[in-house]
Curated annotation (Swiss-Prot):
Subcellular location: Cytoplasm
Source superkingdom: Archaea
GO MF annotation, one: thioredoxin peroxidase activity
Function recorded in the entry: Thiol-specific peroxidase that catalyzes the reduction of hydrogen peroxide and organic hydroperoxides to water and alcohols, respectively. Plays a role in cell protection against oxidative stress by detoxifying peroxides.
Protein's recorded name: Peroxiredoxin
InterPro entries: AhpC/TSA, Peroxiredoxin, Peroxiredoxin_AhpC-typ, Peroxiredoxin_C, Peroxiredoxin_TDXH, PRX_1cys, Thioredoxin-like_sf, Thioredoxin_domain
Anything else known: The active site is a conserved redox-active cysteine residue, the peroxidatic cysteine (C(P)), which makes the nucleophilic attack on the peroxide substrate. The peroxide oxidizes the C(P)-SH to cysteine sulfenic acid (C(P)-SOH), which then reacts with another cysteine residue, the resolving cysteine (C(R)), to form a disulfide bridge. The disulfide is subsequently reduced by an appropriate electron donor to complete the catalytic cycle.
Disulfide bonds, paired cysteine numbers: 198-204
Keyword Hydrolase applies: no
Presence of keyword Oxidoreductase: yes
Gene3D superfamilies hit by this protein: Antioxidant, Horf6, Chain A, domain2 (3.30.1020.10), Glutaredoxin (3.40.30.10)
């Protein structure tokens, strides 16, 4: 089972948009792969609508979105049609029709419920490296804005060599500022308070360059 910091496993998958090779299909871009337990289930349906709502925003962030469950492709297609006809939402992102091989590779099958994929999220960067993995129980839907926030934060983190505080960009202490990495030597530590806003030399912050 891959972990944070590992390369996303290479695989060819059948999707509602045809065959795809991952992660090569999205080389040079971020992508989010999310698994759902099953088609035609209530929580998953609300999640698909919510993911579609933010899909244009994700694409503006150069990030793609891919769904997955252990269902046949015709089930995915029929469910997507139902969502469009009944909920007035066209699902534009591809959904992987998995036979179980992909789910096994990614560790998405829980022994207690071997016929359904767990509710998981993999965030993969433009180099094909897994940057975050999230798991949710079947009875709890995902917080979709948090997933978008992660993409926004990772882009700033990578571009500027900084860290993002809790609840960024609405942190209780430093607002939309980002955290400067702590000094690694005495001389730099002494200069930190002159260069940045700081609570102490090891907790300094600044505005993001894009601000």
């Amino acid at each position: 089972m891959p972990l944070i910091g590992d390369k996303f496993p290479e695989m060819e998958v059948q999707t509602t948009h045809g065959l795809m090779k991952l992660p090569a299909e999205f080389k040079g871009r971020w992508f989010i792969l999310f698994s759902h337990p099953a088609d035609f289930t209530p929580v998953c349906t609300t999640e698909f609508v919510a993911f579609q709502e933010v899909y244009p925003e994700l694409r503006e962030l150069d990030c793609e979105l891919v769904g997955l469950s252990v269902d046949q492709v015709f089930s995915h297609i029929k469910w997507i049609e139902w969502i469009e006809e009944n909920l007035d939402t066209e699902i534009e992102f591809p959904v992987i029709a998995d036979t179980g091989r992909v789910a096994d590779t990614l560790g998405l099958i829980h022994p207690a419920r071997p016929t359904n994929t767990v509710r998981a999220v993999f965030v993969v960067d433009p180099e094909g490296i897994i940057r975050a993995i999230l798991y949710y129980p079947q009875e709890l839907g995902r917080n979709i804005p948090e997933i978008v926030r992660m993409i926004r934060a990772f882009r700033v983190i990578d571009a500027e060599g900084v860290a993002a505080p809790a609840n960024w960009p609405d942190n209780q202490l430093i607002g939309d500022h980002v955290i400067v990495p702590p000094a690694s030597d005495i001389e730099t530590a002494r200069k930190r308070k002159e260069e940045y806003e700081c609570y102490d030399w090891w907790l300094c912050h600044r505005s993001a360059s894009g601000d």
